[in-house]
């Protein structure tokens, strides 16, 4: 199965897309046993390629023991991108997808997306907020936009599984005006798509977002602002209904922080 969009429909017409993918050269961003991420140029534009080369039995068993679905190919990200566009959530633009093989251990697949440039991750954009606070209106504007994006994503049946601020890209130039604000969510290769997002997975995304923004100087008021936008309810009602999530977020964020510190020792 192969799906191509412009310019690949023209450049690769009559050719084997899998053979063309093998010849692509560029900057390697990640090289794993079963996955390769490459940035390359084609016809004067920059793109990203994710090349999946099956998986190992060890990886499948490890994920199943952890009650997680292993990433078996590029199809999950391809479908998530299209679903987010349907929901009105800014994300990558997919221009190519291919998959062949039935056996998950040997299945080969690829996805090609446009390089979102110029952009900066929110992790980098907000890195010095704790010491150099931004204009309050700009901060609240970004908080509101991220909350709206995640709300739409979850309402549309998608949970990210790696929902951290480093996976939200702010498009540049950004002047501080709302009409210039565009944020795209990326790295959807582990995303899950269902009719409804289970509470457990909704909470995992929200906790990941909370943890990844702990060091950028957000106040309790900022967090409440996010919650009001995400849940679309009065704060008092949110605090009553979501007390379990709030407690879980504090406990899990502290646990993740401890684990991160131990890994860096």
From Swiss-Prot:
Gene Ontology BP term (one): lipopolysaccharide core region biosynthetic process
Top-rank EC class of the record's enzyme: transferase
A Gene Ontology molecular function term of the record: kinase activity
Pfam families xref list: Kdo
Pathway: Bacterial outer membrane biogenesis; LPS core biosynthesis
Key words of the record: ATP-binding, Kinase, Lipopolysaccharide biosynthesis, Magnesium, Nucleotide-binding, Transferase
Enzyme Commission number: 2.7.1.235
Deletion phenotype: Mutant shows an almost total lack of phosphate groups in the core oligosaccharide part. Mutant is significantly more sensitive to polymyxin and shows a complete loss of virulence in mouse infection models.
Cofactors named for this entry: Mg(2+)
Coiled coil residues, start to end: none
Active site, UniProt feature: 162
Family: Belongs to the protein kinase superfamily. KdkA/RfaP family.
NCBIfam families for the chain: PRK15123.1
Protein name in UniProt: Lipopolysaccharide core heptose(I) kinase WaaP
Lineage of the organism: Bacteria, Pseudomonadati, Pseudomonadota, Gammaproteobacteria, Enterobacterales
């Amino acid at each position: 199965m192969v799906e191509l969009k412009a310019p690949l429909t023209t450049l690769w017409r009559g050719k084997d897309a899998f053979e063309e993918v093998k010849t692509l050269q560029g900057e390697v961003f990640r090289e794993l046993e079963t996955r390769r991420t490459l940035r390359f140029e084609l016809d004067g534009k920059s793109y990203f390629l994710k090349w999946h080369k099956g998986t190992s039995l060890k990886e499948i068993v490890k994920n199943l023991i952890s009650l997680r679905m292993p990433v078996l190919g590029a199809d999950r990200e391809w479908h998530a991108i299209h679903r987010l566009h349907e929901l009105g959530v800014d994300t990558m633009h997919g221009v190519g997808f291919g998959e062949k093989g039935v056996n998950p251990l040997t299945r080969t697949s690829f996805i090609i997306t446009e390089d979102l440039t110029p952009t900066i991750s929110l992790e980098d954009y907000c890195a010095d907020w704790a010491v150099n606070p931004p204009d309050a209106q700009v901060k609240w504007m970004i908080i509101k936009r991220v909350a709206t994006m995640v709300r739409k994503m979850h309402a549309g049946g998608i949970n990210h599984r790696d929902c951290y601020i480093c996976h939200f890209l702010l498009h540049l130039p950004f002047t501080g005006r709302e009409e210039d604000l565009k944020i795209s969510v990326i790295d959807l290769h582990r995303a899950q798509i269902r009719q409804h997002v289970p509470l457990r997975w909704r909470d995992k995304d929200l906790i990941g977002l909370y943890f990844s923004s702990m060091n950028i100087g957000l106040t309790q008021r900022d967090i409440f602002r996010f919650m009001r936008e995400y849940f679309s309810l009065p704060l008092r009602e949110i605090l009553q209904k979501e007390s379990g999530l709030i407690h879980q977020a504090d406990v899990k964020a502290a646990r993740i922080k401890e684990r991160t510190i131990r890994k860096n020792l």
